[in-house]
Amino acid sequence: MYSQQFGTVPREFKGPTPKAVIIRAKPPKAQRAEQHLKRIQRSYHKYHTTLASIKSNEENRLKCDWIQRNNHKTFDSLVQARVQDAMQGFVINTEERRNKLRELLASEENEYFSEMQLKGETIEEKKDKMRERTKLLREKKEKERQEFVAEKLDQQFRERCEELRTKLASIHEKKVVEERNAQIEFNKELKRQKLVEEHLFARLWEEDRLAKERREAQEEKRQRELVQNTRLGLDAQVTSIQAQRQGARRMKEEEARILEQNKAQIKREDEQEKLQKQKRRQETRSSLKKAVQDKIESMQREYREDLDLNMKLVGRALQDLQDEADKKKQKREEMGREQKIYNDYLMQRREEEKAQEKELNRLLEDIKAKKLAEKDRELALQRAARKQLMNEVMNTRKLQVQERLQRKLREQEELALHEQRISESLKVLHQEDMEDFARRCALAEEYRNQLQMQIAHQQQAREAEKEEERQEFEAGLAANKACLDKIQRILSENQALSQNVHPMRRGYPDKPPL
């Protein structure tokens, strides 16, 4: 498996010297049956684990669905109850408000009747008062309308009068120029104050810088003294630390010497132990060879009781190996039985699949035969329908030919009748033309008379138009005079408004608006 993944793996590895070589141990041989059994067991375990997981997930899903369904039912019932309570409360509140409104209207009506009774007014007096009030309201409304119309006319005059707009623009321009000059002066004053403030800040900054330099010099001096004192303390500490280090170095050298001695002692002990192990291994190997030879010579002979402890241990180890071999053999037999059961199961599944496939083929053949029969029936029905349609088309064609012949005969009869009507119409038209000529002559005479009357009327209209133009000219002169008067009045009002200074300007006369 390793060689399949990573290619051929060399067994020899070179050491630090030219002739030093390390050989990798051979990998153990793969046990196919055990690996196959383990794969089957893993797949079986995985299958059952998946089934258990699916079952638990299904149970959890059903449980969650049941919980959600119960929660939805509980929530729906709670919402329904709250909605019913709210609707019932709304209905109760509506009824209460209606009752209160009825009581209030009844009390107001009673108060109104009692007040009417106390005043002793009659219906006629009340009607007179209502008429007077209506008249006052109408007059007030008419007055407001006239004021509104006058205001709009004045506004329209202000918007359309070019001379007024020119004068107002010149006045506004002069005012803007004055305010701009004042603003420029104010900005110059601000710049001058800003320069003064900058000089003051520069002086304060210089003083602060000098004070900071003095503080830094004092701090530097204090730091130098502190560093000097710290250096002296550190020198003393370094001296003591060096002495401690020398003592520690001597102790380490002593410990290293003792450690070397211990290592040499341990090395000697290891060599002795290695020799003893080799001796014991040789003894064990010889005893094992002897035991194997005895076992080969007589398998049924009882073990001798006078063997030493090492032989007993070897026999016990061999017995364990034999038990393990028996267990492996039994395990292989069980695996063989399981493999046989699995193969039987696979054969049964294949036979069942073949039977299902045969049944499916049979069903497909039946469905195919049914479809072919249905298709044959449909084709027979289509042929019958096509034949019937052809017969209907031929009959319809015959009827159309007959109708066309009849229509042609009717058209010939209608054409003869139409020619007869045309001749009669020509006679009637000639008679109407004669009557029309006589009527036109009468209309021409009447038109001539009306034209003469129209000329006389136009002369009168021109004279009236001249009179109207003269009156309009006089009215225009009067309107021009009124317009000039109005312009003067508006300019005087504008000057009066310009003299009314805003409270902020009165409070700060030296600061023009920005």
Curated annotation (Swiss-Prot):
Deletion phenotype: Smaller size at birth and laterality defects with half exhibiting situs inversus and 15% showing heterotaxy. One study showed that mutants develop hydrocephalus around 3~4 weeks after birth and die by 6 weeks. Another study showed that 72% of mutants that survive after birth die within 6 weeks while 25% live longer than 8 weeks of age. 9+0 cilia of the embryonic node are completely immotile and are shorter than normal while 9+2 cilia within the trachea and brain ventricles differentiate normally and retain motility but have an abnormal beating pattern.
A Pfam family annotated for this UniProt entry: TPH
Residue ranges that the Swiss-Prot or TrEMBL entry lists as coiled coil: 91-176, 205-478
Localisation: Cytoplasm, Cytoskeleton, Cilium axoneme; Cytoplasm, Cytoskeleton, Flagellum axoneme; Cytoplasm, Cytoskeleton, Microtubule organizing center, Centrosome, Centriolar satellite; Cytoplasm, Cytoskeleton, Spindle pole
Superkingdom as given in the UniProt entry: Eukaryota
Gene Ontology annotations of biological process type: cerebrospinal fluid circulation; cilium assembly; cilium movement; determination of left/right symmetry; epithelial cilium movement involved in determination of left/right asymmetry; establishment of localization in cell; flagellated sperm motility; manchette assembly
Main location: cytoplasm
The name this protein goes by in its record: Cilia- and flagella-associated protein 53
Subunit-level organization: Microtubule inner protein component of sperm flagellar doublet microtubules. Interacts with PIERCE1 and PIERCE2; the interactions link outer dynein arms docking complex (ODA-DC) to the internal microtubule inner proteins (MIP) in cilium axoneme. Interacts with CCDC38. Interacts with CCDC42 and IFT88. Interacts with centriolar satellite proteins PIBF1/CEP90 and PCM1. Interacts with dyneins DNAIC1, DNAIC2 AND DNAH11 and with ODA-DC component ODAD4/TTC25.
GO CC terms, sorted: 9+0 motile cilium; 9+2 motile cilium; axonemal A tubule inner sheath; axonemal microtubule; axoneme; centriolar satellite; ciliary transition zone; extracellular region
